[in-house]
A protein has these predicted regions:
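Structural alpha-beta junctions
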Residues: 38-42, 67-73, 140-147
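Active-site neighborhoods of divalent-metal-dependent phosphate/nucleic-acid chemistry enzymes
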Residues: 77-137
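Residue-level detector of structured alpha->beta connecting loops
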Residues: 44, 113-116, 143
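PIN-domain endoribonuclease scaffold, especially VapC-family toxins
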Residues: 49-99
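Short, well-structured N-terminal submotif of metal-dependent ribonuclease cores
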Residues: 1-47, 54-67
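Acidic, PIN/NYN-like endoribonuclease modules and their adjacent C-terminal/linker elements
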Residues: 2-4, 21, 125-161
Length: 161
């Protein structure tokens, strides 16, 4: 891993936390989740309030995220991030107007852009040319680094199990 990659800080998309909780349940792997929490405390990755707010129907993960929020480890989206998110959505249509899906994606991108952060998401590029834009495609156009592979993220936070 090169020096730049080591210093890269990632914002996690909601799908990452959900997938981690499915494949590495909190109740069965305390070590993993404690390590993730320690890395969050050490500012090695970013957890946004809009991501936490999207966690539903997963009591264990909701509880874990609630703990991070109570400990002051969750970063808040500010009004200027919301304004930039609207601009991003106006340029690259991301939000499904019928149900509001992907609203957090524009906030994640806005926050990453402002703070020179990278994004860890399992999203792929859009399939249909006239479909909604996805995180990797918008980030590519805005020169924001994205990754999809958990191993890259775990290496970047120096995770040890």
């Amino acid at each position: 891993m090169n020096e730049l990659q080591e210093k890269r800080i990632y914002i996690l998309d909601t799908n990452i936390l959900i997938n981690f909780s499915v494949w590495i349940p909190i109740s069965l792997n305390k070590t993993f989740w404690d390590g993730l929490e320690e890395a969050l405390k050490d500012d090695k990755w970013v957890l946004l309030d809009v991501v936490v707010d999207e966690i539903r129907y997963n009591p264990e993960l909701e509880k874990w995220c609630g703990k991070q929020k109570r400990n002051g480890l969750v970063k808040k989206i500010e009004d200027h991030n919301r304004e930039r998110a609207v601009e991003i959505n106006n340029t690259y249509k991301m939000i499904d107007e019928s149900n509001g899906n992907s609203t957090a994606d524009t906030y994640i991108i806005s926050y990453a852009e402002e703070n020179k952060l990278s994004i860890f998401s399992r999203e792929s590029f859009r399939i249909k040319e006239n479909g909604l834009f996805k995180i990797p495609e918008v980030c590519q156009r805005l020169n924001i680094v994205t990754i999809k592979r958990p191993v890259k993220f775990l290496e970047s936070i120096s995770f040890k199990n």
